[in-house]
UniProtKB/Swiss-Prot annotation:
Source organism per UniProt: Ateles geoffroyi (Black-handed spider monkey)
Key words of the record: ANK repeat, Cell projection, Coiled coil, Cytoplasm, Methylation, Phosphoprotein, Repeat, Synapse
Assembly information from the UniProt record: Interacts with CTTN/cortactin SH3 domain. Interacts with STRN, STRN4/zinedin and MOB4/phocein; this interactions mediate the association with the STRIPAK core complex and may regulate dendritic spine distribution of the STRIPAK complex in hippocampal neurons. Activation of glutamate receptors weakens the interaction with STRN and STRN4.
This protein's name: Cortactin-binding protein 2
Predominant location category: cytoplasm
GO cellular component terms listed in the entry, alphabetical order: actin cytoskeleton; cell cortex; dendritic spine; FAR/SIN/STRIPAK complex
Feature: compositional bias, Low complexity: 386-396
GO molecular function: protein phosphatase 2A binding
Biased composition (Polar residues): 411-422, 583-593, 1619-1640
Amino acid sequence: MATDGASCEPDLSRAPEDAAGATAEAAKKEFDVDTLSKSELRMLLSVMEGELEARDLVIEALRARRKEVFIQERYGRFNLNDPFLALQRDYEAGAGDKEKKPVCTNPLSILEAVMAHCRKMQERMSAQLAAAESRQKKLEMEKLQLQALEQEHKKLAARLEEERGKNKQVVLMLVKECKQLSGKVIEEAQKLEDVMAKLEEEKKKTNELEEELSAEKRRSTEMEAQMEKQLSEFDTEREQLRAKLNREEAHTTDLKEEIDKMKKMIEQLKRGSDSKPSLSLPRKTKDRRLVSISVGTEGTVTRSVACQTDLVTESADHVKKLPLTTPVKPSTGSPLASANAKGSVCTSAAMARPGIDRQASHGDLIGVSVPAFPPSSANRIEENGPSTGSTPDPTSSTPPLPSNAAPPTAQTPGITPQNSQAPPMHSLHSPCANASLHPGLNPRIQAARFRFQGNANDPDQNGNTTQSPPSRDVSPTSRDNLVAKQLARNTVTQALSRFTGPQAGAPPRPGAPPTADVGTHPSVGRTSVKTHGVARVDRGNPPPIPPKKPGLSQTPSPPHPQLKVLIDSSRASNTGAKGDNKTVASPPSSLPQGNRVINEENLSKSSSPQLPPKPSIDLTVAPAGCAVSALATSQVGAWPAATPGLNQPACSDSSLVIPTTIAFCSSINPVSASSCRPGASDSLLVTASGWSPSLTPLLMSGGPAPLAGRPTLLQQAAAQGNVTLLSMLLNEEGLDINYSCEDGHSALYSAAKNGHTDCVRLLLSAEAQVNAADKNGFTPLCAAAAQGHFECVELLVAYDAHINHAADGGQTPLYLACKNGNKECIKLLLEAGADRSVKTTDGWTSVHAAVDTGNVDSLKLLMYHRVPAHGNSFSEEESESGVFDLDGEEESPEGKSKPVVTADLINHANREGWTAAHIAASKGFKNCLEILCRHGGLETERRDKCNRTAHDVATDDCKHLLENLNALKIPLRILVDEVEPSNYGSDDFECENTICALNIRKQTSWDDFSKAVSQALTNHFQAISSDGWWSLEDVTCNNTTDSNIGLSARSIRSITLGNVPWSVGQSFAQSPWDFMMKNKAEHITVLLSGPQEGCLSSVTYASMIPLQMMQNYLRLVEQYHNVIFHGPEGSLQDYIVHQLALCLKHRQMAAGFSCEIVRAEVDASFSKKQLLDLFISSACLIPVKQSPVKKKIIIILENLEKSSLSELLRDFLAPLENRSTESPCTFQKGNGMSECYYFHENCFLMGTIAKACLQGSDLLVQQHFRWVQLRWDGEPMQGLLQRFLRRKVVNKFRGQVPPPCDPVCKIVDWALSVWRQLNSCLARLGTPEALLGPKYFLSCPVVPGHAQVTVKWMSKLWNGVITPRVQEAILSRASVKRQPGFGQTTAKRHPSQGQQAVVKAALSILLNKAVLHGCPLPRAELAQHTADFKGGSFPLSIVSSYNSCSKKKGESGSWRKVNTSPRRKSGRFSLPTWNKPDLSTEGIKNKTLSQLNCNRNASLSKQKSLENDVSLTLNLDQSLFLGSDDEADLVKELQSMCSSKSESDISKIADSRDDLRTFDSSGNNPVFLATINNLRMPVSQKEVCPLSSHQTTECSNSKSKTELDVSRVKSFLPVPRSKVTQCSQNTKSSSSNTRQIEINNSKEENWNFHKNEHLEKPNK
């Protein structure tokens, strides 16, 4: 059965219809077993075996099934007793191995045989039937086709007849119309000529008016600028004079007051000297004074420790409140401080009034309260006379003794004051501290005289500067304070009454120490305050008046008993006193009275604002052999460390600012010294020197504020920083070092609060309680951290102070340090392990505190500072390995290290629900908010108790920051999609331009997004098409939707967000922010409508040709069918034509027509026969017999300038103009047969010509085409390069427009000006074939920060493109009119020497006038690139006039040179190859480069390019022998170019410093000579370097007559404007030739000037 089935396969293949059968048969024929390989045969065999097995299985299954059915049908009627059924059953049940024959014949085999036979027959019949049907169908189809063709033939024949009839009528009508139109054309042509003539006249008038207007506008602008400058100068001068007048008036008023006071004081002195009673010394008076006595056993040396700069004191407030009182200049004639200096501070007040100190130190921890002392008429500094002497340098270590100082010997009380002198003992921060007495003057007279000396600013006749009188406050704010003035006057009166003391031998006056007891101690230390004389230096900014201090009376208090101290002087005593941050000086006294009563007049702070003085400490070295007590050096540790950047006062509420600063001089006789005043031995300080056995007696008596005991004194010493006293007190037994006052302040607390590190160290080493808290819970560490004393903090931390101690309000030291804003303290506390998360009772954390003060450094430390792994020290390795550095904040700290604080701490809310972000936003601390926002866990939507977010309470700046927190910055770019790549000048066009970056916020809606996209596109189009470098913000005020180039949001074809298309106005379910995040859109791409849509928007954007002009070009092509685009080479003609053809093609295809573009490049070998074949093959030119085709054909002929237009197109002009069968043209085909052809209406012809203008026979073609001229000085070419380069710059700056002062803008403007100036010069030279279109400049590189790249590119463009074109154009013009033997070709191959000279001169002129001029590179940098430009080394130092008189070779009258460089010998400028010594002088024509007297030598020597080719100069005789009139005309044109006012002068190239943009015609280094009328050019004279002397001589007309006669024809010498004025005057008055040249050349130069002005406008 298998074989039967296999054999049936061919029969089954005939079952399908004929086509399928034929395919199967063909496949069978192709199948050849012989060609199969061995592996393929095996595969086939295995397949066939599998098929056979499958068939056998199927057959067996079918056989069994058929058997059962057959038996059932045949024997089903028998029952069980049927013998046949029993036999069958028994047979089948037999278990024999061999197959047994059936009982009867098997009906299945019969049935299968019948079925196989029937199947075969059926397949054969079906195959035959299918073949018959297919043949029948073919026959029917052929019949139908034949009938259709016959019917169509009949219809076409009828239609042909109808069309012939219609065409005849149309042709007759057209003939009549043509006759009528020809008449009208003639009339219109006549009218057109008239109108054109009128138009030209109007244009001329308009041009003249425009020139006048531009000149007038420029003049008015310059005048306006000058007026503005003068006005600003006048305003400044007026303000200065007004201020000076005010100062002088005030000074005059002060001087008048001084005069009145002086008169009164003199009278008082006279009266006082006569009536003053003798002095007595009561033991105890109300006016007790401090006496310092010293014995001058040997000369004391004053060691000056000076600081003449402002010391940063403990309180920043004091800096504002205290006047600066440092003398301006040392004065030998004035004392350091006069009597009763206003504002002086009682040096002993700190010891005398402990109650004040204690009360003042109990203020708030962070509060500011500076103690003020009430004025007292009884407390004052009393001087017996001034002390004058030498004034050494204050910075010198050992000031010399005065020259007239007597040796320190014991003096008797009777010595007169005139003979009494002593060496200076103590001085403090004053250049005139060490002063000796003038021996010839009475000390009282000196006191009065110095008291009424002038202001410290007024130097006397000796050059010294005197101090202002201390009796009045000269600060500007107190001049109007009558109370302060009256108080000062009273004080002066009282003080001067003390000056009238008795002479030697007179009884002492009461209240003064007796001189008899201290006569052997001539040197007395005194303490005084520097006067306010220097405060008058600046009257303009008075210091602010300090507020009244709480707790201090403003009324005078009763006088207090003073401390009298007699200390051993063997050790240096510190005499500096700080009284309210004033350092009190102690100059010596050399009066016979000897004893200086030290008392201070305390004035109210409210009436005398003061500034801190410049502190300096002079330590007096006492004689050797004397023991110095510990107290003598008590001020060593009194000055706190100056902490930079403190925001809180270091000593806000304590009186430590008035430490005891007393001059101590020991007495040789202690008993005598102590017996001077009873009770002196009871003094604390006297006892400290070793004379008293106990410190317990009362220190004071009669004062209102006595000391309360040792613990109070301990606190006072700690608060004032008195290390010596503190160490003495700590050495006592039984003293409670941890005693706390009523406010709970311990000594350690006071020292830490005021920043006295030495005191803190002493107290801690004495085991003071480091964590002792006051009544508010503040520990010393809290106090030090709050005040910013990081050294104290470091000490306290080292002594295991509780770092996280919380005060009653929950404030920790870290919280207080953050509140103060001292980053050193914060860093120390963090490294010590301070907890950032501790909260106050109000819920504030240290982060809240740092943000509340707006301190960025503190917040950064809190967020990023990591604690070192080991110890408190900060190792270098750790700092380098990720510890946040405040100085490195620019390097994005979050990139280096992640924030240390947790999100919970950042988002922690205080009691009112405010987070740190709320505080920063509400206070406008944008920097702090920005740092908080860097933390990834910040929740900006957290709401406070009033349901407000940080955004709700933020200021405008912070709102903007929060809105842009999660904003996406996605660049928006414009994609210029070209259909097919082309070589039509589009290589330089950028296909992708990024115009801006859109900020997409979370709350941005799709409407806002659409508006933003549209606005960004509109702004971009307006920015790139504007005339100047306007930013995108500047153009937003312009409400016009269309830009100058015609592009707007309507020009968009499609927008894609990432890869998803989107259109303006479309909305998605997600917000724009979510959409961008989900789709991971990295950019938004805008596609503009292009030629494929029948639009030209993308072409406009790519080429920067305005859309309106492109649409006009397209309209011309559609309307006239024959259009030729012509312009200078590189004017993008090919690109424009190709894009127009694409747009036209897609428009026709959209209208249902098929369209084809045929392009042909024309060269010199392109023949008319090739053009005919092109027209015929493209079906543009069809035979007359053939019906017109419906297909649109666009033919582009490129480079038509390479062939003759008249020869190439002559035979096609008529049929192109009249496209119909009525005006056919007969053309001969290649086989010799002629046939009539015509152009049909569906053919468009466009051509391109790279020529500026047509010439000769080509003009015959002009009237048969529509011409589009692409002029370089007119749109679209004029502004194309500017717009293109601006768009390139915007793309380079990622959508931003740089400011005009940016170097990129300057270099781009320079490239633009090079193109314009180059074409302007070439047009003037009459070489239009050398003009360049903007295409060559489109590749200008824009590299920010690398302007030299553009200069290198320009040199390559100059060498590769410009120079060959100019050379060819010059040679072709110079050889046009030569005789045939010297034709153009010959001239180009072998140019004459004259032609070579003209070419070199022209190249040099062009290079300097058009290219190098205006280059923004600095001169030195430009000089490095100048050598890269070819043709710039032509020196052009030759001049010849145009008269024909011959001259001897040596004469150089007509070859006048203008050279600003040093004169060189003429031999250096000769070129051997051009030199012919034997040439006769008769052959030299003076019609040569007469005024080519350029100073190229000088300019190029400065540009380092002449040194390589110094000898490139033509010799006088051979140099410029011009063989034709054209060469002479060229030379004239070159001269006029160099002398033209309208052209840019290269003389400024070497003159300008770094900006070569401005130019002048003055000619410091001119390449060619400028005419004398350039004197009229409005150019700044400051920009021109002065000339050498020989140029000045040549400028004037005072030359020899011979020289003037020779050069009388024309003078193009440049006259520099920067030189003396007589040059111009002489020239204008006497040079008639110059005036004539000016008149003759005015029209041409004005025209050029206007053109230049027109070109320069876009750059402004």
